[in-house]
Amino acid sequence: MPHLAELVAKAKAAVEGAQDIAALDLVRVEYLGKKGHLTLQMTSLRELPAEERPAAGAVINQAKQEVQEALNARKEKLESAVLNARLAAETIDVSLPGRRMENGGLHPVTRTIERIETFFGELGFSVESGPEIEDDYHNFDALNIPAHHPARADHDTFWFDATRLLRTQTSGVQIRTMQEQQPPIRIIVPGRVYRNDYDQTHTPMFHQMEGLIVDRDISFTNLKGTLHDFLRNFFEEDLQIRFRPSYFPFTEPSAEVDVMGKNGKWLEVLGCGMVHPNVLRNVGIDPEIYSGFAFGMGMERLTMLRYGVTDLRAFFENDLRFLKQFK
């Protein structure tokens, strides 16, 4: 088999010349396939004398093994080249800025509500809630607001029909609570309320917090002490605070509470007063035995004062540039 060495040399050259796996497989078929050159060498053994066949077969098998080893080595090299090319294409440029992880944060109004709930919770107040679609009895009548009161006008209130409306205050929850519970009562009522108004300091929907205590021997002194402590805790300052006489149908006497701003001007922060005897009677509580005080405040207004926000509407515009300041 003088040309066997030449076949092996040609096969190895073809193997090295293969530039991809498909071309390499063609070389394998050409030399080691069923009709390959080296396979045909094995079939030609029958032409040799019997005593020469073993030695010739060993030589052919050695040649086939050399070609197979060359094929394996070339295949491994080509596969490695393909993998390296893919890895190079997929290489991560560590110098590029990564994706920012955006952490959520509480809305500033939510922060205010939670801060107030925490303060009053430590004083033994429980948190109550009620329907936002209210009837005129709980929103007006039971709160000593007569039919001719301006608050019932269409331009101030969103009415569904003659008796149902979007609540204009959370005070209706006070009525429901007093109807269901006997004194002593100590609650706060956070929630959304609705009024037909929209400008820099008013929105059609805003958040309000009501507070109510009903018990024996509750006085205006208790009211003042509670609100003094609350405001100084909320603003984290020893503020100058004043109570101005005011009027609310559901409290008597009534007052509005102001704090001294950094500009030397008084800023109104909330309204309050002693629960009107008529309100207590409307819910079946004897005003000769029990008394109470109530207060109400706008969450957006307190948030504006605490954080120095000048436009109420910013709380509702979902501008992340604004909201991220409160994380």
UniProtKB/Swiss-Prot annotation:
The terms describing its cellular component in GO are:
cytoplasm
- Enumerate the Gene Ontology biological process terms: phenylalanyl-tRNA aminoacylation
Q: Give the record's cofactor note, including how many are bound.
A: Binds 2 magnesium ions per tetramer.
> Highest taxon of the source?
Bacteria
**Key word Ligase present:** yes
* An MF annotation (GO) of this entry: magnesium ion binding
Catalytic reaction equation(s): tRNA(Phe) + L-phenylalanine + ATP = L-phenylalanyl-tRNA(Phe) + AMP + diphosphate + H(+)
Q: Which cofactor does it need?
A: Mg(2+)
Keywords associated with the record: Aminoacyl-tRNA synthetase, ATP-binding, Cytoplasm, Ligase, Magnesium, Metal-binding, Nucleotide-binding, Protein biosynthesis
Q: Where does Mg(2+) bind?
A: 252
Q: What is its main location?
A: cytoplasm
Q: Which Pfam families match?
A: Phe_tRNA-synt_N (PF02912), tRNA-synt_2d (PF01409)
Subcellular localization is given as: Cytoplasm
Name the PROSITE patterns on file: AA_TRNA_LIGASE_II
Q: What is its EC number?
A: 6.1.1.20
Please tell me which top-level EC class this enzyme sits in: ligase
Family to which this protein belongs? Belongs to the class-II aminoacyl-tRNA synthetase family. Phe-tRNA synthetase alpha subunit type 1 subfamily.
Q: How does it assemble?
A: Tetramer of two alpha and two beta subunits.
- Annotated protein name in UniProt: Phenylalanine--tRNA ligase alpha subunit
Species: Yersinia pestis
Q: What gene is behind this protein?
A: pheS
